[in-house]
Amino acid sequence: MWRDKVKEYEDFILEDLKGLLSIESVREDDKASAENPVGPGPRQALDYMYKIAERDGFGTHDVDHIAGRIEAGKGDDVFGILCHVDVVPAGDGWDSDPFNPVVTDDKIIARGTLDDKGPTIAAYYAVKILNEMNVNWKKRIHIIIGTDEESDWKCTERYFQTEEMPELGFAPDAEFPAIHGEKGISTFDVIQNEKADDQDEPEYELRSFVSGQRYNMVPDEAIANVAVKENMTDVIQNFEQYLNEHDVEGESVVDSGVLVLKVQGKAVHGMDPSIGVNAGLYLLNFLATLNLDKTAANFVAFSERYLFESHFGEKMGMKFHTDVMGDVTTNVGIITYDNQDGGKFGINLRYPEGFEFEESLTRFKGEIQSLGFSIELGKNQTPHYVEKDDPFLQSLVQAYRNQTGDDTEPYTIGGGTYARNLDKGVAFGAMFSDSEDLMHQKNEYITKKQLFNATSIYLESLYKLCVEE
């Protein structure tokens, strides 16, 4: 029944999704203002969702242009569908324009198809279809739309300062059948705050280093500018040998007497950095072979001692595992250095229930202080968990099983979704077990089958939970 109903709307779903995907809704702090709190792109995407909602007869409510909601249904209780329309930067290496959606016979290719614009449109259409069926709602539906999920969650932080908190809800921002637990997520900067003096002119001076744009992405590019006193050819040859030995890509060029070294890695979501290739850490690992100026040498040595080839907090003394949520993970998403101010490592650490985060960070902070480094804590979100046998969760899972015939159990993840804003919130789709996970990677896509099947699952689940029989 539900899949047949979705068939009537497939062309409309694709058109509305293409419009949303065409908006480059990446956070841009340098363009932020009161009108565009995290930049013009995310604001434009938020307004786009208001526009299609008003076209379809729904009410909307804006919260300071950084978040808002689409309203449907009726009743005392509120059911929340928590979505986001911001995306991570596209990065390089795409086979097509990431913000000019390509629609083939079986897929839609663009940044945000999986995370989270495709699932957002699927959930929206589930509500739209039910509304156009003139169902007898027993709950109010709030489709809550954020614009800063990929960075600091300023959107939901502001939204829930003044707006009603749903009793139940889901975030269509992960996988089916359902995610009932999410690791704690923290971001912090390790800052080099002591410069060392060189008594003699160094053989190699690190002028600058840059890698990564987001804490929650494994950086796929790193660039270092090195002033070479002598033996330039030897350094270039050693760099090429290093790339071959470590099976990573890169290049070197000489620009105005300065050696520019570049490494290409593999960007993946920061929740599991072990499956990516961190370009920044590999380039620092090569720089460790050079007799650098002392300040740079201390920066590189820090990476070697605590970060390189340590995806699970081992080198920082934070290794921890539970059977329910798995391992601590550490992603070094941002690395910067210049010869005037020193360097910074931007770290995204994810941890399971039972991990003593504050105690561990305090210990690590004390350990690195003597090395000339300090820590600035950004955001820390504690782990989130809903019991697997909760009736609400089971209702969602049953809708999934009815539509797919798959009896896979709900599970926990290292990622973080808006579901953790709710006491009883879970992540629910829109990826399936056979979906290729290209979130935060080049050539991100969603299949039409996945998009329409997710819409059908959302339809059935919302009908069971929010409509009078």
UniProtKB/Swiss-Prot annotation:
Show the active-site residues. D86, E149
**Cofactor(s) in the UniProt record:** Zn(2+)
Where Zn(2+) 2 binds, per the record, is at H84, D115, D173
Q: Where does Zn(2+) 1 bind?
A: D115, E150, H440
Its GO biological process annotations read: L-arginine biosynthetic process; proteolysis
Enumerate the GO terms in the molecular function aspect: acetylornithine deacetylase activity; dipeptidase activity; metallopeptidase activity; zinc ion binding
Q: How is the cofactor bound?
A: Binds 2 Zn(2+) ions per subunit.
- Return the Gene3D superfamilies for the record: 3.30.70.360, Zn peptidases
Could you say which EC number(s) this protein's record lists?
3.4.13.-
Domain of life, source organism: Bacteria
Q: Which top-level enzyme class is recorded in the Swiss-Prot or TrEMBL entry? A: hydrolase
Q: Which residues cross the membrane?
A: none
Q: Which UniProt keywords apply?
A: Dipeptidase, Hydrolase, Metal-binding, Metalloprotease, Protease, Zinc
| Family of this protein | Belongs to the peptidase M20A family.
**Protein name per its UniProtKB record:** Putative dipeptidase SSP1012
